[in-house]
């Protein structure tokens, strides 16, 4: 009985862990993309401000 439950738990863990890892990975990737986009936006705004200052 204990052995069957143990194998069931292992199976469940395996079936839950892989999607969870995938979800976490996707989340990390999307947050990294968000951070990159933010950095890019900041960079562009700084460049725009700099060009405005040099035009004056």
From Swiss-Prot:
Protein origin, superkingdom: Eukaryota
Subcellular location: Secreted
Protein role: This synthetic cationic peptide inhibits the development of Plasmodium berghei ookinetes, kills intraerythrocytic P.falciparum, and is cytotoxic to the Drosophila S2 cell at micromolar concentrations. No antibacterial, antifungal and hemolytic activities have been found at micromolar concentrations.
Known tissue expression: Expressed by the venom gland.
GO CC terms in record: extracellular region
Gene Ontology molecular-function annotations: toxin activity
Organism this protein belongs to: Mesobuthus eupeus
Protein name: Meucin-25
Major location category of this protein: secreted
Family: Belongs to the non-disulfide-bridged peptide (NDBP) superfamily. Antimalarial peptide (group 5) family.
Alphabetical UniProt keywords: Secreted, Signal, Toxin
Span of the signal peptide: 1-31
